[in-house]
């Protein structure tokens, strides 16, 4: 029997993720959305691409959560984007309501699933998903660092004039302006990145990475990134379903790692069939640790705002 992946939210990120999951034949896909006709139409459209692209999986579009029963993975992409004039608290309130609704309906139907959160504010919504689902910490994880690291690697490859395939990089922290790219742990085919790029240019790349999502929002005018976010999500899905033990930066629940507690935070982890199989603690220097602490304060503040609601 093929694995079953349920994607909650049939917007750009959800439907693009469904496409890549199907094309990689990672499993059968259930696409869920509250808008009648949208998941059904996108699901049917995607199914009809199968004969052309050469994939053969079952794709179901639905407004009914019962179709998600027995899922191996639940991906939550549904959420409202931050609009002009909207405070961080406003965004938390709106998306917390959506997340509670999605998780309370999907989790009981798939008690052994692994949940991958993709909606924003990412670390806070992942924290909420763990609370609402009651799942153990290893089976609730947030997708942020894979995307942020991909942006970082892309900018480094552009600057160095080399293949993006040869950039190895790590990034930590909350998904936002306080993320912590780690140049000291960045190499080009094992060669320190500082052999290719000056500190000044590297600092500029780090800054651009932090603002990576906003840069695309500003260019699009309406909407936000979806190709890279969905690709990042599918990389995590594949790592879990194929038990690849990938070392990826993900939003994980911490209990003492890096001196942090009761927080979802972007850290390197081993991702496999058990979900987050272990968190890796890097030997950070004082400067890096200070940036991590600052980032953690921003995430903790967001989680505190959630708890106060």
From Swiss-Prot:
Keywords attached to this entry: NAD, Oxidoreductase, Tricarboxylic acid cycle
GO molecular function: L-lactate dehydrogenase activity; L-malate dehydrogenase (NAD+) activity
Residues spanning the membrane: none
Protein name: Malate dehydrogenase
Classification via InterPro entries: L-lactate/malate_DH (IPR001557), Lactate/malate_DH_C (IPR022383), Lactate/malate_DH_N (IPR001236), Lactate_DH/Glyco_Ohase_4_C (IPR015955), Malate_DH_type3 (IPR011275), NAD(P)-bd_dom_sf (IPR036291)
Matching Pfam families: Ldh_1_C (PF02866), Ldh_1_N (PF00056)
Chemical reaction(s) catalysed: (S)-malate + NAD(+) = oxaloacetate + NADH + H(+)
SUPFAM superfamilies hit by this protein: LDH C-terminal domain-like, NAD(P)-binding Rossmann-fold domains
Record family assignment: Belongs to the LDH/MDH superfamily. MDH type 3 family.
Binding site for substrate: 82, 88, 120, 151
EC numbers for this chain: 1.1.1.37
Active site: 175 (proton acceptor)
Function comment: Catalyzes the reversible oxidation of malate to oxaloacetate.
Organism name: Roseiflexus sp. (strain RS-1)
Chain positions recorded as NAD(+) binding sites: 9-14, 33, 95, 118-120
Gene from which the chain derives: mdh
Taxonomy of the source species: Bacteria, Bacillati, Chloroflexota, Chloroflexia, Chloroflexales
Biological processes, Gene Ontology terms: lactate metabolic process; tricarboxylic acid cycle
CDD domains: LDH-like_MDH (cd01339)
Enzyme class: oxidoreductase
